[in-house]
Amino acid sequence: MTKNPKILSIVLAGGEGTRLMPLTRDRAKPAVPFGGVYRLIDFPLSNLVNSGYRQVVVLTQYKSHSLDRHISQVWRFSPLLGSYVSPVPAQQRLGKHWYLGSADAIYQTINIIEDVQPDIVVIVGADHVYRMDFEQMVQQHIESGAEFTVAGIRQPIEESNQFGVIEVDPDHPNMIKNFQEKPPTTTGLPDNPNQILASMGNYVANTKALFEALALDEKAADTKHDMGGDIAPYFASRNEAGVYDFNSNEIPGSTATDHAYWRDVGTIKQFYDAHMDLIAYVPEFNLYNQDWPIYTMSGNLPPAKFVHAGRDRLGHATDSIVSPGVIVSGGEVHHSVLSPNVRIHSWAQIVDSVLFDGVVINRRARVYKAILDKNVVLTENSTVGIDTEHDLARGFTVTPDGITVVPKNTIVDD
């Protein structure tokens, strides 16, 4: 391995996102808006760029139009400097089928890797919210001598069936002894039986070894063609898999509160909870860390505006994120996230909610513990999140935790 290896980054952005329905009804999961002005894809791309990795391929598949458009508009680099972020849709180069899994997605685009000829491939998912310096992970990968390294983070043992579970070699703490993808039961860590070391879905691989593993997987009969389910266990079985402890990752400008923050936002509850993490007085995830910025399209929007200051008609927002272009006109917003161009009219009330772009809340309408997709309109006196049975009767999604989701372009008229 050379001292300054050539790096190619691959972002796996082809997931269908069925658990986030109806937010993924018309868009790919990585294109789902997050945090007011961002999309989920902005987080892994920002991490890669901030790490100094600017040759990036984004593998897309389902409903990718808005994702492709966002990447082409926001993530533009000068090719003169050899930098690029390129969306690559499913090519069907090896057969008339979609990607069969994350490993198959990489195998089907192996020609792109061959053209670049990197020494190392960095592979990341597109549906997590976090900050990470991948350079630190790559350096450990090189020093350990591993062919394949998995980023790991501690998670509650009761969630083991949602993650790849890493068992570390006690004699070599940077190496993986065993890797199981989403086991129904498992044992906890030696120092904390209530926790597991879970895979974050981020990998670093030596290119030659990765090619060999993908080729074997493509021919295997009993495989799901999955990076976590098949490729990681393959390297672990050969004693060639390393583990990188995410807790050791140091980010400029991070605080004790948001150090090693990582959230899977693959379900409505996880997506909602991650938004609530943003708006605390001391947020669990700090969007305002300019030493490691999260990039997105800035747009030509005017500042947010709050109007009406009467005793019974006060336009205001508390404990909330309010994006550019928002007008709060005599309404009340509390503990919520408002995306650009939202309108809150007089005597309306928004509490514990997430509103996407262009939502309009008319007079005396009320929204509680809800996610409203783009361009939803609530007419005067209408409600969302107040009466669960009424929400279900209108065809809205209501989670077991009481989060109501209203699909894009819906007019709510009680």
Curated annotation (Swiss-Prot):
Catalytically driven reaction(s): alpha-D-glucose 1-phosphate + ATP + H(+) = ADP-alpha-D-glucose + diphosphate
Binding site for alpha-D-glucose 1-phosphate: Y99, G164, E181, K182, S199
Highest rank taxon of the organism: Bacteria
Record-level GO BP terms: glycogen biosynthetic process
Database matches in InterPro entries: ADP-Glc_PPase (IPR011831), ADP_Glu_pyroP_CS (IPR005836), GlgC_bac (IPR023049), GlmU/GlgC-like_hexapep (IPR056818), NTP_transferase_dom (IPR005835), Nucleotide-diphossugar_trans (IPR029044), Trimer_LpxA-like_sf (IPR011004)
Keywords linked to the UniProt accession: ATP-binding, Carbohydrate metabolism, Glycogen biosynthesis, Glycogen metabolism, Nucleotide-binding, Nucleotidyltransferase, Transferase
PANTHER family per record: GLUCOSE-1-PHOSPHATE ADENYLYLTRANSFERASE (PTHR43523:SF2), GLUCOSE-1-PHOSPHATE ADENYLYLTRANSFERASE-RELATED (PTHR43523)
HAMAP family: GlgC
Record protein name field: Glucose-1-phosphate adenylyltransferase
Biological source species: Bifidobacterium longum (strain NCC 2705)
